[in-house]
């Protein structure tokens, strides 16, 4: 209580940006401010990037939940463009850079035909019937994401590192952890290699049975644990892993026309597994790393 009184004594507003604020932390701050001061301290946010110098939207009003980035600031236009299952945020205004220095290739890719900057983030209206209530941040259109600490996770490199660390046991994987405290991996097993590790695996054993094999789980744990010893940073360290029995689906766009895993589509389709991976009390098949 004494620390809370000292913390809130002269506090009038809490501003956060660069990474999402978990809703449970938002609620705890509100509850603590009410218990200490008798009223709620205002929490607010804004949004933008280096290319928007850096402000593009802000919330100049009280918000009821985390994740609202506000409305466009004066002189700025933001349009929401359907991209897959999300709406991509694109920005235009006098604050937006005209391009990248001596990189016409990057400049051409960064803007659409109407001159809007492709920032790579997704969003949606907090209230579809009232745009004045602001835009709700909805993750990244691109694969890379931030942890709740604000640290960027570079998905492509981490995916390759995870597959190499547990080689040859993993066929492919998707990287999870947007707005989480740690990185998680959903991985497809290399069935043939996994059967070599499980001496008692019957030839006809199903993938769902195979991925519960104790010897397999132990082997994957050893490989990832060895990788973690050399990669202790939050953006590269793997905190938990779950093997998946169902292979990636072409019909569900989990595999691109080039044969690559579509990270965003896979995570969207396998959202229940992501929830299982990050559960407070995970199931036995979730491999946890200290």
Segments the model singles out, each with a brief description of its role:
Residues 1-4, 32-41, 126-131, 164-169, ...:
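Alpha-helix termini
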Residues 81, 87-147:
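Conserved ATP-binding/catalytic segment of the ANL
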Residues 43-45, 51-54, 116-125, 135-141, ...:
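Extended, hydrophobic alpha-helical segments in both membrane/secreted and soluble proteins
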Residues 96, 131-161, 194-214, 234-235, ...:
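Adenylate-forming
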Residues 171-176, 181, 197, 221-290:
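Conserved C-terminal "lid"/linker of ANL adenylate-forming enzymes
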Residues 1-85, 181-182, 189-201, 226:
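Conserved adenylate-forming
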Residues 122, 165-193, 228:
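C-terminal boundary motif of the adenylate-forming
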């Amino acid at each position: 209580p004494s620390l809370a009184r000292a913390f809130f004594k002269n506090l009038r507003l809490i501003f956060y940006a660069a990474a999402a604020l978990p809703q449970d932390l938002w609620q705890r701050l509100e509850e603590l401010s009410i218990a200490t001061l008798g009223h709620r301290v205002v929490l607010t946010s804004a949004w933008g990037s280096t290319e928007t110098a850096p402000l593009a939207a802000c919330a100049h009003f009280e918000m009821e939940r985390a994740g609202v980035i506000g409305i466009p600031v004066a002189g700025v236009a933001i349009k929401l463009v359907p991209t897959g299952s999300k709406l991509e945020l694109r920005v235009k205004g006098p604050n937006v850079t005209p391009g990248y220095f001596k990189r016409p290739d990057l400049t051409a890719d960064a803007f659409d035909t109407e001159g809007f900057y492709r920032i790579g983030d997704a969003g949606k209206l907090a209230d579809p019937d009232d745009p004045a209530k602001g835009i709700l941040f909805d993750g990244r259109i691109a694969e890379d994401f931030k942890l709740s600490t604000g640290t960027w996770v570079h998905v492509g490199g981490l995916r390759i590192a995870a597959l190499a660390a547990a080689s040859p046991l993993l066929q492919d994987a998707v990287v999870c952890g947007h707005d989480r405290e740690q990185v998680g991996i959903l991985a497809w097993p290399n069935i043939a290699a996994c059967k070599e590790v499980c001496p008692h695996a019957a030839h006809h054993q199903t993938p769902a049975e195979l991925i519960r094999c104790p010897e397999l789980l132990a082997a994957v744990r050893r490989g990832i644990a060895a990788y973690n010893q050399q990669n202790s940073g939050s953006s590269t360290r793997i905190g938990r892993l779950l093997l998946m029995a169902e292979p990636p689906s072409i019909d569900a766009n989990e595999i691109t026309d080039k044969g690559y895993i579509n990270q965003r589509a896979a995570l969207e389709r396998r959202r229940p597994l992501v929830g299982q991976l990050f559960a407070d009390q995970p199931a036995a098949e979730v491999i946890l790393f200290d």
